[in-house]
Regions:
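Flavin-dependent oxidoreductase catalytic cores
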Residues: 1-323
């Protein structure tokens, strides 16, 4: 079984990836937050910085592309090839309204025939290995049957299935029955993505779907960066589900690497604080209690106040036990 880090817009950029890769059990692949090539055949400076090889040393990175124009996709794959990337991922899963309103991400799933033409064009013109990250459809999981018919016509590197429809966003439980039908009918390797927050969650997916080749971890890793180690059994102590002081120290080092990384590239305290507060919306779940410190982190307007709140949280609060 292989493990991938999901692309989480605004969070899992190269600062986060480097810190995670250096401190915790490495992923087999890391997927970048989406790149959105525009009609002028260019990428934003921020997007380009995120995928530059020198900013991702030793990291097996797969750039993700968001577009519904085959010409832009092919251009982007050639640009990425110049940077050394052989595999790219097509985003057909983003549920954001600003994305889907333009018929991109999960919004592209509303136009199966247009998607079919798009795939025909990119597979006939691009030299890249192409994987797809998809949802089940827009409103009804039954839409996935037609989508699978389309996907099966093309030589996908891999199909990453998030078994929710666009209208679910991240609510409701993943539709495992629909995922099962997709996994059985797929002509390429299948990766599961969705609601793996604990070791038990992973075991249930692995047991039910022994044919899948990989699992993609997203919010579960953001909430508990040691999740992959727990799944692999690399940080469990016999007879105890408690956390060790070494684990807490590693989590602090992880935080500090991200913090100093953002200070280095962001302009001004406000922007650094915004990025760190976004991280804490997930990372705060790793701690027992400490609500008053978490509130201080959220309300901090100066880096000094932020540092004091984080220091107190790590000093006085324990990590939630393994489950």
């Amino acid at each position: 079984m292989k493990f991938y880090l999901a692309p989480m817009e605004g969070i899992t950029g190269y600062i986060y990836r480097n810190a995670y890769h250096q401190i915790f059990l490495p992923m087999d692949k890391y997927f970048s937050p989406f790149l959105a090539p525009n009609q002028s055949r260019s990428l934003k400076t921020r997007e380009l910085q995120d995928i530059l090889p020198e900013n991702n040393p030793g990291i097996p990175l797969v750039p993700q592309i968001l577009t519904n124009q085959w010409e832009d996709f092919v251009w982007a794959t050639e640009k990425l090839r110049e940077l050394g990337y052989r595999e790219v991922n097509l985003n057909l899963g983003c549920p954001s309204g600003t994305v889907t309103a333009k018929g991109r991400g999960a919004g592209f799933l509303a136009n199966p025939e247009g998607l079919d033409r798009f795939l025909d064009n990119i597979f006939s013109r691009s030299t890249a290995e192409i994987s797809i990250k998809t949802r089940l459809g827009i409103k009804d999981p039954a839409e996935f049957e037609r989508l699978m018919e389309i996907y099966s016509q093309y030589p996908l590197k891999e199909l990453i299935i998030h078994p929710r429809v666009r209208e679910d966003y991240y609510k409701n439980l993943p539709n495992l029955a629909a995922f099962a039908r997709g996994a059985v009918s797929s002509s390429c390797p299948v990766c599961y993505n969705g609601n793996i927050f604990t070791q038990k969650d992973f075991w249930e997916i692995e047991t039910r779907f022994p044919q899948i080749s990989a699992v993609m971890l997203g919010r579960g890793i953001l909430k508990n960066p040691m999740l992959l180690e727990e799944i692999a059994g690399e940080n469990r102590r016999e007879g105890s589900a408690g956390r060790t002081s070494e684990e807490k120290c590693r989590l602090r080092r992880f935080h500090d690497k991200i913090y100093t990384g953002y200070q280095r590239i962001m302009s001004g305290e406000r922007n650094t604080l915004f990025k760190m507060k976004e991280l804490w919306t997930y990372l705060g779940s790793a701690f027992e209690g400490g609500e008053r410190y978490k509130k201080k982190i959220k309300k901090a307007e100066r880096l000094k106040d932020y540092e004091n709140a984080v220091g107190a949280l790590f000093e006085e609060c324990t990590l939630i036990g393994k489950n």
